[in-house]
Each structure stands twice: as structure tokens, then as C-alpha cells.
Amino acid sequence: MIRATAMHRSIVQRRMLSTASRLQQAAKPATGSTVGTANGASAASGKPPGATFEGASKQKKKTHKFRNFVLLSTFVGAGAFAGGVYYSLQNDQFQSLFVEYVPAAEHAINYIEEQQLRSGRLKIATPTSKHDVDQSTVRVPKSGATWRAVDSTDAATSAKSASSPAANVAKDVASPAPAATASPVSSGSPKTDNTTVPAVRLANDSDPAVKAAVQTFNDLIAVAPSGAAKQLSAKVSTVVDQLQHNVAQIKSEAAEEAKNSINKLNSELAKLKASTGEEISSKVSAAEQQLRNEFAALRAHSEKVYHDRLRVEIEATKSLVSSHANNLIQAVEAERQKQYAQEIAERVETEREGRLSKLKDLQTSLTQLQDLALKTEQAVDASGRTAALHLAIAKLTGALKGSEPVALGPYVESIRRAAGDDPLLQAALDSIPEVAQTEGVLTPAQLTIRFKLLEPELRKSSLVPVNAGVAGHLGSLIFSSLLFKKSGVPKGDDVESVLARANIALEQGKLYDAVAEVNTLKGWPRKLASDWLDEGRRRTEIEFLADVIAEEGKLYGALSSKK
């Protein structure tokens, strides 16, 4: 059944396509004739043909091929369906084929027949020709009163030659025949009984089939003689009552059976809906729980990997700074001990030569020793400040690389205290916005998620004009769904190309390139992406300042050691 329905639909679609192509071919000559007429008119007016249609070509309206095709297909399909329903009402053989291969045909035919039956336009077929009347009429042999005596042998011969239904009716009707035939023989004069017998009456709400049968019996009573007609009328009334009772009983049984079938189908449909809904809800819940578990596991793994990497980098930085400071301290201490030993040796030598003569030299040496101790303390202090600066810069970098926005104010203050009077570091720290110091900045992952959420809205507004109204927005919403989504690194300034390049840049971790691509948008997409652009610019500015501070921090230790 499904295969036959699909074949019928394919045949109807091919017919509609062929009809549309024929209509287009028929419309082409008309178009050519119109163009020729216009060219002739332009030639008659002294203007070249191209000048005549130059403005018209610019104002050429859309052909709406898709809309015309849909309308034509709808009208052709509706006409074919209506014609099939009409012919099915006229031909039973075509009706069986039409109901079998066309969906919803049976419901339409049943509805039309029910409406015709209710309005009284659908009637039971009755014999319309003499041949049909002869075929549907039961022949009854002559009996009852007649103008001559009937021989018993002739009556028997005629009764035997009749068919079985006619013979049964003849037996019931011809039972009073002897008394009726005796009277004309005894009287000896032919008489005709012209007494009319009343016809069988029915109520107006009787079944049409019963009405047709009663009408046939009434015609038979009107034709039959009066004596037999009275008996036939009484029996027919009994038969009609029984027939009407049987028809009413059959109708009630059919209605009850139909009602039971409908209730059974409704209960089965309700059970099927309930079971299907429970199965679908259980599957959706299971799939949702599985996705949540996978996301939680992936998030935990990513956090663990990031924290491990951050801990290793911090430990490496601490060890590097500590080793560098220890090396400086040991070198200064060794130099001081060496100088102190040298001074002691010189002093001992001087004392040997004479204490009083060398007091001036001893004072000079002590002064130099004090200067050396002061320089050593300054070097140790600078080394401590350098280590503190490197540690504060590492904490700021770690906060920027975290998975959640963190207020940068404490890290900025720690770097400011460790930087001292360095003008470049102070300028870089002053350039950090107050919002970032109090609320922090969004992470690259958060910016990527926000861009994914913003991307459909940008695509919907990609076709909105600059000063568009409600119609422009609705048109952009509808036609933007027909655009193809680009991938890779396409060229061009259209919204799809810009979104594709921005997605690639975000996937590669190049936030600066993604912000630059989104910054090239214009119109409504630029307005919708303004908040995301502000967050992205703030993030890139903070990263740039953090890089400047880190590079200056590397040079800070070398400059301090030289001083």
C-alpha cells in the first residue's frame, strides 16, 4: 500500500512538472510577440530598441518562479483530486482503485456520500425502463374475479411455468381463486370489480430501501385485481413492517459495532501514544544524563591538566628566581670576604710597618669597606625586589589564564609595590582599566562560547538594511536561513566569510585576529556584536599589558644588578 501511494505521488508530481513546462513553453511565444511589438513601436517613434527597454530592464519585476510553481502544483493536485472524487462517485470500479492508491480519498468520498444522503440528493436506484421493471417485477398468474371461467388445467399449467419466487407468491394470492371463479359461472354474466384497494403507507423517516420496496408492492397492488389485491395488501403490510423492523435492527447493530470499533481504536491509539511518549522521554533523559556526565568528566580533566601545568610553571619560576638570588648573594659574600681578607692582610702588613704612619690609609680602607657593605645590601635588596616582582607577574599571568574571571586589583598592587619607581611598569599598571581590576576579564573560552551564541543572531541580521523596519528584519530572518554556512578561511567582506574566519581564529587561540575580523562588520551585525567586541578588546589589551609587564620584569633584574 505504501509503495503504491509513493508511486502514485511520483506520477502526479511528474504530471505537474510536465504541465508547468508546457505552460512555460506556451508563454515564451507570447513574450516574443510582446517584445517584437515593443521594438516595432520604438522603431516607429524614431528611437532605438535598446533605448525603449533600458528603463524597463532596470525596473523588471521578479518572476516568482518558485511561488508560481507551488501554486500551480497545488491547483493541479487539487483539481486532479476533485476530479478523481467526482468520477469515483459515478464509477464503482474506479472508486475502488482511487481509494486504494490515493491517500485520504476514502474519507472524502464517505463524507460526500453522507452529505448527499442527509440532504436527500442520494437516492436508491429504482428501475427506470420497462425492461428494468419487467426484471424486478414478480409475475403473478391470473386469479380471482375474471370475465370468464378459468380451467383448472390452464391455471396449473401457468403456475408450473412460473419461476420459484413467482410461484410462491401465486400460491399465496391464488388461494381464494375457486370461490371467485365459481361466482361468474353460477351467475352466468361477466362482471368486473372496480373497487380500489388502499396502498400501503409508511412514515416519512422510513429507510429509502424500504420505501422503494413498498412502492413496488403498491404498483403491484394497483395492477392486481381487487380481491387478490386486498389479501396482497395485508400481507405486504406485514412484510413491510417486518422489513422495516429488520432494517432498523441492522442499523442499530451496525451503529453499535461502529461505535465499539471506534472506542477500541481510540483506546489502542491512547495506549500507543502513552507508550511512545514514555519511551521517547526515557531515551531523551538517558541521553541528556550521558552528555552531562561526559561534560563533567571532560571539564574535570581539563581543570586538572591546567592546574598541574600552572603548578609546574610556578615552581620552576620560584626555583629560578631563588637560585639566581642565591648566586648573587653568594658571589657578593665571597667578594666581600675576599676584600675583607685582603684588607686584613694589608692592615696586618701596615701594622707591621707602623700603626701610626698608616692610620690614614686604614681610615680610607674602612670607608671603602663600608661602601662595599652598602652596595652588597643594595644588591641583596634589589634581588629580593626582583624575585617579588617576578612572583607577582607570574600570579597575574596565572590569573589571566584561569578558567574563571578574577579581579586583577590585588595582583596589580603587588606588582606596583615590587616595581618601585620603574616608569614603564608604573605606566603599564596605570593603563589597566578599573573594571578589569575590580571584576576581571572574560577568559578565551568564555569569549568563544559567547561568540557561538551570538553567531546565529549575526547571521539572522546579516541581510538587514541600515534603516530597515519590521519588514526588513522579518525578511532577513527568513532569507538568512537559506544562506550556506561557510567554513575554513574564505575571502570576502560578507558576514558569512567574517564569521568563518573569526571561528577559525578562536579555535586556534588567536583572540586578537578574531576581534579584528569581527571589527570589520557593518550595520546591524556590528551593533549586535558591539558588547562582544568590547569584552574582546579589553581581553586583548590586558594580555598586551601583561606581556609588556613580563618583558620589563625580565629586564628589571638586570638593570637593578648593574645599578
From Swiss-Prot:
Gene Ontology biological process: cristae formation
Key words of the record: Coiled coil, Membrane, Mitochondrion, Mitochondrion inner membrane, Transit peptide, Transmembrane, Transmembrane helix
Residue ranges crossing the lipid bilayer per the database entry: 69-89
Compositionally biased residues, Low complexity: 38-51, 149-170, 178-190
Stretches in topological domain Mitochondrial intermembrane: 90-563
InterPro entries, A to Z: MIC60
Subcellular localization(s) per the UniProt record: Mitochondrion inner membrane
Transit peptide range per the UniProt entry: 1-17
Annotated spans, Disordered: 23-59, 128-170, 178-197
GO cellular component terms given for this protein: MICOS complex
Ranges per topology, Mitochondrial matrix: 18-68
Membrane topology: Single-pass membrane protein
Domain of life: Eukaryota
Residue ranges that the Swiss-Prot or TrEMBL entry lists as coiled coil: 239-379
UniProt subunit comment: Component of the mitochondrial contact site and cristae organizing system (MICOS) complex.
Its job: Component of the MICOS complex, a large protein complex of the mitochondrial inner membrane that plays crucial roles in the maintenance of crista junctions, inner membrane architecture, and formation of contact sites to the outer membrane. Plays a role in keeping cristae membranes connected to the inner boundary membrane. Also promotes protein import via the mitochondrial intermembrane space assembly (MIA) pathway.
Record family assignment: Belongs to the MICOS complex subunit Mic60 family.
Designated name of the protein: MICOS complex subunit MIC60
Organism placement in taxonomy: Eukaryota, Fungi, Dikarya, Ascomycota, Saccharomycotina
